[in-house]
Amino acid sequence: MRDGQQSSFATRMTQEQIDRCLPYYPEAGFYAMEVWGGAVPDSVMRYLNENPWTRLEKIHDAVGNVSKLTALSRGRNLFGYSPYTDEIIDGFCRNAIKSGLGIMRIFDALNDVDNVKSTVKYVKQYGGIADCAVCYTVDP
């Protein structure tokens, strides 16, 4: 629900389109299903005029406990383009877990551990699983 539509449709699948796909996901029985990443919350609000929290809640309601919902977060930048204060990170993580997110995969493009600490702390505090990632490239 995240990468395919992000790569192929510029994160512009409407809630109605997602709703048509949802009945198939519980049957698939995935351990986890990534629903948010990079630009999803921003694009949902900016281009579709939809509520990303409602989207997360509807997906969670449809999938239930069959699959954990996951998100890819940019550490201190969360899903935005600038670093946020701990108060913003706290509220965002609290609402994400409350709305059905089970796992947040967290990275910093510069692999600066200080930029992921707050997000890890709050995800765990609210009962989610913090899944940290490291960025790397293979130089030709």
Predicted regions and their residues:
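Ordered, soluble secondary-structure elements with a strong preference for glycine-centered loop motifs
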Residues: T11-R12, P83
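Acidic, glycine/proline-rich low-complexity segments that act as flexible tails and inter-domain linkers
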Residues: R2-T11
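Anaerobic metallocofactor- and corrinoid-dependent redox/one-carbon enzyme cores
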Residues: Q15-D19
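A common structural microfeature
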Residues: Q6, F30-A32, V66-T70
